[in-house]
Amino acid sequence: MLPLIEKFFKALGSEGVIYCHWKSTASLAAAAQGEDDLDLLISHESRQAFLGVLHRLGFKEAWMSKRASQIPGILDYYGYDETACKLIHVHAHYKLILGQDMTKNYHVPIENVYLESSFQGEFFRIPAPEFEFSVFVIRMMLKHSTWNAILGGQGRLSGRERQEMEYLHKRVSLERIGQVLTNHLPFLNSALFDDCVRSLQPRCPFRVRVKAGEQIQKALQGCRLQPKGIDIWLQFWRRLAMAGKRRLFRNFRRENTKTMKNGGMLVAIVGGDGAGKTTVIEGIVEWLSPFFVTMKVHMGKPTWSWMTILIRGILKVGRSLGFYPFTRGSMDFRDEENPGSFPGYPSLIREVCTGRDRYLSYVKARKQADKGAFVICDRFPLPRMIFMDGPQIERMAGTFPNNWFIRLLGRLESRYYRFISLPDLLCVLKVDPDTAVERKSDETAAFVRARTKEIWENNWEGSTVHVIDANRSKMEVLDRTKALLWAHL
């Protein structure tokens, strides 16, 4: 069992929280290792104590980015186990809400007796097999044996669901099943329940499955949260919307639609060449994106706006016609001792475009973070940075006469950077310049040293600034960054 999960359940016990792991008891070993969700049914009287335990152990609440998809009585909390470098998902249920995955339209009000039947298992408290099996059959019928589920290609149990059914079926007593149905699920008689169990078998005739599906929906009509017609329409519409997103967005996954309830975070990862920024950023995105809305923004090389494309196109035509030579002035690391030559007005104009694009990227990133998403920025404009990602025109102009046009371009560029506020969390990867030169062999030593030295020699202070020793291994740096990010949510 992972350390965080062990602490969590010990705390639940010491606080007297009434709970049980209400489903999927066939795979509790995976849940104890953080591989599966912790699906917990919580007594209403234990709600405050339960929330207190989550808060003390650093769990954060998330919800569906589209509020209409949020199911009442079901909440999601995530914690970070630093030892295993895993996110732990606690799926907290205060009500037994069942149904097709798209809508969950049925409430079976047997929470109290379900919890009363629970006992301590190998890992967690689990319900009596007869209660779990009864609810499992209802869940599978609503999920796989309705007309719309069958027509949507979801009319059969998955391999994992079939294993779970076999696991539970071996542990139940038919006599006790009958008692559960009679005493707690009176709308579901034994004959209908037997038909439902038979309809879930692999070779059950189609007509038997459909008939049983219609009968159980009729038996559960008093448990519906919405009318049947609305439920079917919502399932159809959401399935259609998901299919469209999969076509439009190649990497679309349904799971990554959650955002943080208390707001997301704008995180900037900065560092010189060879500091391992790319490894850290890719690792963070890979870690968060299966669970949450996650966005990666390259502030060093921002996406070109239509204005930038137009202006750069005009400048390219001018260069092709021989109005001015090609220059790369922005890449020269000049200072007062080495002012260098004036790169030409086109280079200054391009810097204004870059400043504007960085500002637009920042605005987009900030909006997403405010909506609860995680936004990971590769580099970031900072006041103390000269060579990387800040205003460049004054430095590039050097000793060239400071005429009105240069001053105008400089003011335009500076204005965009003034509107860019600091990120919620700034992670500075500091690596020794000599080490950076060794790591970044595909660039010139002078180029790498100048950019890395600026990070290395700066005095980084501030409540949102955290310096990370990037001389360590890549995995150590990544793990440290993950821990900082989660702690600052």
What is each residue range found by the language model?
Residues K277:
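Conserved lysine of the Walker
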Residues P302-P401:
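ATP-dependent small-molecule kinase phosphotransfer cores
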Residues V280:
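Hydrophobic positions on the alpha1 helix immediately C-terminal to the Walker A/P-loop
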Residues G272:
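P-loop (Walker A) phosphate-binding loop of NTP-binding proteins
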Residues M1-D36, I42-M265:
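Conserved NTP-donor binding/palm subdomain of two-metal-ion nucleotidyltransferases/polymerases, i.e.
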Residues E214, K218-R238, V428, P433-L489:
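NTP-dependent small-molecule kinase module
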Residues R379-E457:
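A glycine- and Lys/Arg-enriched "phosphate-lid" helix/loop adjacent to the NTP-binding pocket
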Residues P290-M307:
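Short beta-strand-centered segment that lines the nucleotide-binding/catalytic pocket of NTP-utilizing
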